[in-house]
A protein has these predicted regions:
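Intrinsically disordered, low-complexity boundary segments flanking structured domains
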Residues: 1-5, 127-130
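Short N-terminal helix-initiation segments at or just after the protein's N-terminus
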Residues: 2-7, 88-92
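Conserved beta-strand hairpin/beta-sheet module of binuclear metal-dependent hydrolase folds
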Residues: 3-62
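Active-site HxH/HxHxD metal-binding segment of metal-dependent hydrolases
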Residues: 44-47, 53-148
Length: 148
């Protein structure tokens, strides 16, 4: 199990405003280990994957870290390894493309149990707004307040 409370002094944080609804996806990397968590990866999964792996394509809208492989190595940051997917809640724009990220990364997906039902409605909710998302994913681990 991954400890999601990444206790680092200077985490590398990137924000992506993704999808037609411009939802904010955060990518947080521990600069000492390269461990990376993707938060709310509900849209444009390929954009996120391409950037995390090779700094290719349209990068983040904001970052406090390197913007190329060369800058990453110059900063002595290890190669990134996605260790978990996490959602703040299960609106379709936040969780709709989690299945695509789960295919790309063999990692656990964390979601609060109160959002399980909402997640089952992701496709139906998306269609109401004219969007299509894959069949909803099922969380691997339930987030609980105060637990690590």
């Amino acid at each position: 199990m991954v400890r999601l409370a990444m206790a680092v002094k200077e985490p590398w944080v990137e924000y992506f405003f993704v999808g037609i609804l411009q939802m904010r996806c955060s990518v947080v990397t521990d600069v000492t280990t390269g461990d990376t968590v993707i938060i709310d990866g509900g849209a444009e999964p390929q954009r996120i994957i391409d950037w995390v792996h090779s700094f290719s394509g349209k990068g983040p809208d904001w970052t406090n870290g390197p913007r190329s492989t060369e800058e990453m190595h110059e900063s002595s940051i290890p190669t990134r390894t996605v260790v978990a997917l996490l959602n703040t809640h299960a609106h379709f724009d936040h969780s709709g493309h989690i299945p695509d990220l789960k295919k790309a990364y063999d990692v656990d997906w964390y979601l609060h149990p109160d959002d399980t039902y909402l997640q089952t409605l992701a496709q139906k909710s998306a269609l109401r707004y004219g969007f299509e998302v894959p069949e909803p994913a099922v969380a691997d681990i339930s987030l609980q307040a105060g637990k690590q």
